[in-house]
Amino acid sequence: MDEFIKMLKKVKPNVDFENEEALVDDGLLESLDIISIISEIADQYGVHIPSDEIIPDNLNSAEALYELVEDLK
């Protein structure tokens, strides 16, 4: 999970990914940020996130996003 957080901070360095639980709902991640994160996940983890999984519930916290990636491996 630490490496995953580092990857997220590379995309959006000023966000507290360890503690934030409403990244999308609070507007901390915008559409271009989400595209960048999905691209990084594909590059680093070899995981393709289907468009029907790109929903706030899966993106509102680093933990939720990490669980999604693990489920898709």
Question: Where on the chain are the PLM-derived regions?
Answer:
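Residue-level recognition of oxygen-bearing side chains
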Residues: 22, 37, 64
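Short Gly/charged-rich anion-binding patches and loops
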Residues: 3, 36-37
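Thiotemplate assembly-line natural product biosynthesis machinery
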Residues: 1-16, 67-73
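C-terminal structural segments of small proteins and small subunits
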Residues: 47-72
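Phosphopantetheine carrier-protein modules
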Residues: 9-28, 47-55
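Two-component histidine kinase catalytic core, primarily the HATPase_c
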Residues: 33
